[in-house]
């Protein structure tokens, strides 16, 4: 009878699982949310000190700081 009570207590304690943030690891997410050789970030809107260079997928902008922008040679 004691082991039955112990098992019931364990089931009750294990059924109460605390909420955990699910999803991709934050380090992996950081790699996939970057663009332009890991110097830019994929965002909806670029910040004040950033400029838009290319697209990330179909709906996000690759925002790069001006100092990280590649030099474009023009004839």
UniProtKB/Swiss-Prot annotation:
This protein's UniProt keywords: Antibiotic, Antimicrobial, Defensin, Disulfide bond, Secreted, Signal
Signal sequence range: 1-22
Ranges that cross the membrane: none
One term under GO cellular component: extracellular region
Pfam family, any one: Defensin_beta_2
GO BP of this protein: defense response to bacterium; innate immune response
Family, per entry: Belongs to the beta-defensin family.
Role played: Has antibacterial activity.
Name of protein: Beta-defensin 30
